[in-house]
Regions:
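A hydrophobic, helix-centered structural microdomain
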Residues: 2-72, 108, 183-210
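Short loop-to-helix capping motifs
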Residues: 29, 99-100, 113
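Hydrophobic structural segments characteristic of membrane proteins
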Residues: 107-210
Length: 210
């Protein structure tokens, strides 16, 4: 790693710590509202904790507000939520549309396990069914190792620009592009666009999000 790259990474990490700290303090009242709404709806747990692959593939516990029914994967397995998925709760639909279900990941960012901008954090050993019905391990897809060279993020090129319903392995193209060209200015731009998408509540739409 060159001196310039080291300075860039230090600036990115400092930016993450500052913004995550401000976000945690500013959003504290919202956490209480969301937690109360989740509890009142079905009485289940407020948070959902799941192992994800982080920087260089190291596992960490990603924290989210629960947006599905309790034990949603029992009988279904690790199946990604689909449009109008019956496992998603009423409160969960609002949280997903505005990305507020990922608000607790500010803590993951503050701890250094995630960044504000980067590839989406995947589960270790995550699989995907390709068009022919073949099961494919995402870790075996070209570009997986390269996307692990940076911390996973709340938002990123793939999250903002890739169509929501394309296979994740195709989103790796966006992730690889980010890894090669990321900068603090690109991060700021993606964060601002993400705020706009959140304000519109359009994270779950099929087409253009903003």
């Amino acid at each position: 790693m060159t001196v310039l790259q080291m300075l860039s990474e230090s600036a990115k990490r400092g930016f993450d710590i500052m913004l995550a700290g401000i976000g945690l303090l500013a959003s504290a009242p919202l956490w209480l509202v969301v937690a109360l709404a989740i509890k009142l709806e079905d009485g289940g747990p407020v948070f959902f904790v799941q192992q994800r692959a982080g920087l260089k593939g190291a596992p960490f516990s990603a924290l989210k507000f629960r947006s599905m029914i309790p034990d949603a994967e029992v009988g279904h397995g690790a199946v990604q939520a689909r449009e109008n998925d019956p496992r998603v709760t009423g409160v969960g639909r609002v949280l997903r549309a505005t990305a507020m279900d990922e608000l607790p990941q500010l803590w993951n960012i503050f701890r250094g396990e995630m960044s504000f901008v980067g590839p989406r954090a995947l589960r270790p050993g995550e699989i995907e069914t390709v068009g022919s019905g073949t099961i494919e391990m995402l870790e075996d897809v070209g570009g997986y190792v390269e996307r692990c060279r940076v911390r996973p993020g709340l938002t990123g090129l793939a999250q903002v620009y890739a169509p929501r319903d394309i296979p994740r392995r195709l989103k790796f193209r966006y992730d690889r592009l980010y890894v090669r060209r990321h900068s603090l200015w690109l991060d700021v731009r993606l964060i601002l666009i993400s705020f706009w998408i959140t304000a519109r509540g359009s994270w779950e739409v099929r087409g253009r999000k903003y």
